[in-house]
């Protein structure tokens, strides 16, 4: 990827980076382990982002 990135592309990459994290501990505690992990986790090698 080029070094110079447009601001819109940089914002989309930052949003994807922030959303790619595990769920907080209090969520699994509040739901009594019905929600164990986030299903939207993405690995940089396995699946690529679209429209960026």
Swiss-Prot record:
One of its GO terms (molecular function) is structural constituent of ribosome. Pfam families: Ribosomal_L39 (PF00832). Keywords: Ribonucleoprotein, Ribosomal protein. The keyword Ribonucleoprotein applies. GO terms for cellular component: ribonucleoprotein complex; ribosome. GO terms for biological process: translation. InterPro entries: Ribosomal_eL39, Ribosomal_eL39_dom_sf. The keyword Thylakoid does not apply. Belongs to the eukaryotic ribosomal protein eL39 family. This is Large ribosomal subunit protein eL39.
């Amino acid at each position: 990827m080029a070094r110079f990135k447009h601001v819109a592309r940089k914002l989309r990459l930052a949003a994807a980076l922030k959303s790619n994290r595990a769920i907080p501990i209090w969520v699994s505690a509040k739901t009594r382990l019905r929600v164990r992990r986030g299903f939207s986790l993405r690995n940089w090698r396995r699946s690529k982002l679209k429209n960026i």
